[in-house]
Amino acid sequence: MGVLTLINAVPQILNVSNVAGVQISNVGSEDVTSTILVNLAKEINKVVCGDPTMAGAVVTHGTDTLEESAFFLDATVNCGKPVVVVGAMKPATAISADGPYNLLEAVTVAATPASRNRGAMVVLNDRIASAYYVVKLDANTLDTFKALEMGYLGEMISDKPFYFYPPVTPTGKTAIDISKVTSIPRVDILYSYQDMHNDTLYNAIQSGAKGIMVSLQLGQSGERAAKPDHLDCRCRSRRRLNII
């Protein structure tokens, strides 16, 4: 479904803002690539950040990988204008589909001056969450995007955004300049488990990964038994590789 079709399906949007639709890509979120994300962020930086008449940007996105794209935009959009990522948990053909109302709320948030300087946000199901913290917890319920540690930035009340506190920058947040970036090296993410073998690491390396992030289930007391052996000396020796 193209962006203009989405806009035309919710005419109430025109009561909130003058909307200009731009089609960056039209793929399922499971097929979103780093190249698409780089192009998207550059377009927002150029068209939205560079135009004083633009209040903000709304990105419609499938929910399979929505939080990943939102986090990327949070790190790469270089202005204080709101970038709102929105999706739907029900298909457009479902009874009481949530997509149209979510889109209306997302446009409302993006058009609201109080939304500035909050980074990229995710808006679904009356919730306003920071893209820096939001996670998807359930593939089958409407209220699935959560901000468990930080909490939500706000919520929609009577069709208007209500923020719980003023804008604040998350601790450790880093801005990334992608103005000269054309592609991003492949980085694989591997999850540790009991009896994990180094073969999974070697396969990632042989398949072309330039970096590997290993999610180790470690407590504060120390390492656990499933840590792969000799990560540095055995894997790094195969080729230049970053392992985190």
Where does each model-flagged region fall?
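Short coil/turn connectors at secondary-structure junctions
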Residues: 16-17, 52-56, 78-83, 115-119, ...
